[in-house]
Amino acid sequence: MRNVGNYYINCECGKETSFTAAKSYMSQTVIALLFAAVLSHDEKVLEQIKKAPDIIEQSLCKNIEEQVKKSVPLFRNVQDILLLGRGFSYAVANETELKIMEASYTNAKAYSSCDYPHGPIATTNRFIPVIFFLTDEKTNDSTIKLVEKIKKDFSVSTLVVTIMKNILQWLTKRV
């Protein structure tokens, strides 16, 4: 590889043993973020990158796996899953689409939540559950409105993946 490009960065993640390429994907994502932070001289981002292992460990210690296991029955016997996100969350939805298809052989399709109401929503039906990714406080309101519309108009089962600790309180405040 050293002879292919002018420069070479080893991900240092070891041999990839997962068919979903989880280690290499996460390592390459961190390298891309690190590259952008160094290029822009953004010390805040560099500090956040250094905290990432602790943040991931903390997330896993807070019953995240149990929450995931509780939501899985909703998706167990479906043939299709929709994933919606906006901004950074759209990239997460796209990667989740691949991981779901590779790991479970379930058809999955990711859309931008701001584009979805303008065409793809016509394919929505109550037999296809939707996973929403909410991480951007600037766009959460419009995405929550889309969650509510899809649930009301199509009786679709939904899962919301969010960084918001008190999403129910937040929803109550915006009404």
Predicted regions and their residues:
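A SIS-like phosphosugar-recognition module
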Residues: M1-V175
